[in-house]
Amino acid sequence: MKKLTRPLLFLLACLVWACSSTKSLKPGQILYTGAEVKINPDSSGKIDNEKQIKNDLEAKTRPRPNSSILGIKFKLGLYNLAGEPKKPKGFRNWLRKKGEAPVLLNDVKLKYNNDVLTSYLISEGYLQANVTGDTIVKEKKGKAIYTAVTGQRYKINKVTFPPDTGILTKNINVNKDKTLLKVGDFYDIDTYKNERIRIDNDLKEIGYFYFSPDYLIIQVDSTIGKNLVNIKVKVKDIAPDAAIKPYTVKNINIYPNYSLRRDSALRKLNPLVYNDFNIYDNRNTFKPKLFDRLVFFQKGEAYNRKDHNQSLNRMVNVGAFQDVRVEFLPVDSFRNNQLDLNIYLTPLKKNSLTFSVTGTSKSNNFVGSEVKVTQTTRNLFRNAEQLDLSVSGGFETQTKGTSLGKNSLSFTAEGKLTFPRLIVPFYKPNSTNAFIPKTITSLSYQMLNRGSEYTLHAIKGEYGYNFKENQYKEHNFNPISISYVATSFPDTNTRDSLFKNNPLLRSTLENQFIVGSNYNFTYTNQMEDSRRNNVYFYGALETGGNVWGLFTSKNNEGKRTIFNVPLTQFIRVEADLRDYYKITKNLIWANRLNLGYGYAYGNSSSLPFVKQFFAGGSNDVRAFPARTLGPGTYKVRDDAIFADQGGDIKLMLNSELRFKIVSIFYGALFVDAGNIWLRKEDLGEPGKPETARLGSGFRLKNTFNELAVGTGAGLRVDVSIFVVRLDVAFPVRKPYLPEGQRWVFNDINFGSKDWRRQNLIFNIGIGYPF
């Protein structure tokens, strides 16, 4: 570490000099450093949520000061470092554009901010609030100080709704007990806006298609004294006749093969009348019964927003249309209370072909590429089905380490057929959810050739269902999941050598039938960008051999088999919880907890290789090569023929601080911790202690003492449609070392070539690690 002290100090000095915030200021210019709000400074009275109100007020001031990361104004530093470019192009000009010009105190408009902050306080119920502003200058830096005198916060004394003088006001009063305006609550303008929206939503459900929240007024009387207000809800006199009467649906016209070019021709067609639908399509693109599942409206019923939104969502999510447009038109120019519903659907192309090439560089020193071709056929049986046929092949070679020059080949072929409905034997479900449920069948073959070690063949077939409960929750259930896994070896000597050094591999890599079911659940609110805290959760349960084990007999060895292949029996559960906390717009603290547990029983002594848990790698504990960490305190030998180490139990924790550097470049600082374990210690074969994996068994009291810990930094290029990342990590805790020696901070030596070769792990990946 001492060898790096001088270079680091020099680099730090250059950084401080470049980031000097006042370096480029001209004489008389003052750098604006931000705003501070003081609430009732001359009074001992405290207001509710003072800290939150203070933060909200400071956030509303303009302009914003120059951005900073951990207190350092990097963008201003880039601007200062660039200076005045002498050429219209070039590096200095580019650097200046990526930076930020200094925000000056002269840019602050005190009166404007006074008015904005006062208005905000009034909207929060401080009807007598007043804000005044001033500036403070120290050397070349200045800030704005705003003093807010709030007065008392007003409460609601009484709420009055319009009298029942007509159908509209009667319908408003029907749900007045659901009002958001509660006697005793504080005055809050956002609540009043939401109350208007609530009334509008209620009316939209009973036919008031043309009504709008703008036709409601909420009058506030603050003259009654004692810091109280009376609230009166009224319908504006200017509300048009169309807005104050309910409408029913007369005709439902569907154009399933619509285009602007064919618009006039389609309207001249004689429609196919099916149930309540008039279908205009002389090409019979879709079967009419498809629209029973997509369109929730019926002739003669009152318009309601729920059916409107559910119909729209289903048509968008069915995966058959590139454009969906829904139009409600008044019949006979508003002379009656009826609407015609016109649905214009533009189908996606029947067939499409996608081709992709990806490069890989893994933390176990394998580099290579993969080619994938996917053929998609839509609307296969004219019911919006989708058939996906894909073929992919990949090649990897190890560039360094004890397995230098080892190659890995992979080939995958998969067919997947998706039906936009639930297909359940002996039952016809009727789903009214906005998100259309799907039945998915798939069949795949995968071959993985690990050079001179082994070749893994896997055939898998599944039948199951996918359905979204709402925009946050998604379920996948495969009641039938059948896999056949077979392993071949170059010769018997290779096989015997593998099993001799690791007897547990015999049960792991033997030919197996996996017949079972699986279910997984996903919850996420990541689509809500306005949230400060976003959460993602994934939970999975998988079983194998449970039911089939009851119907298969045992062979001479006491094994239950299907076609003379052992039936695998196990239970496997996994949970993945992630939290993303936005400290600022460009600074996010991401955390993950990953847990896994597998239990083999009955016919099986260990989990199948494809169902085991692994640790290490670019999306795991990044300071350790992929699949080489654990189990427990065991360390695989450097000369091991088979380095992959699987386990029955997994615990992993990741914490990552993500920040924007400039433009599309983002940085990250991270810490990873985790390990895998076997449920029981692997003692090897009797009389062969060299085959044992000592320390591999799970003991609850030793869990945290046996965690591996790594840390590092990353650079990410985020261009919206994909993210390319480079992470470099190194271990700070090695669980396979003797107790008391596992923390290795004192061994860190970036100046040592040997230390870097043995400890630095580079990970290149597509997308974020979690």
Residue ranges and their predicted role:
Residues 3-10:
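Sec-dependent signal peptide recognition
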Residues 39-41, 148-152, 163, 233-237, ...:
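Flexible glycine-/small-residue-rich
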Residues 284-285, 304-538, 622-623, 629, ...:
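Gram-negative/organellar outer-membrane beta-barrel architecture
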Residues 370-376, 412-416, 442, 516-522, ...:
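One-face residue pattern on beta-strands with alternating periodicity enriched for small/polar residues
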Residues 15-18:
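C-terminal motif of bacterial Sec signal peptides marking the signal peptidase cleavage site
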Residues 126, 208, 350, 382-384, ...:
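Strand-connecting loop/turn motifs
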Residues 276-280, 360-364, 476-659, 669-701:
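C-terminal outer-membrane beta-barrel translocator/porin domains of Gram-negative envelope proteins
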Residues 2-3, 20-317:
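Interaction-mediating elements
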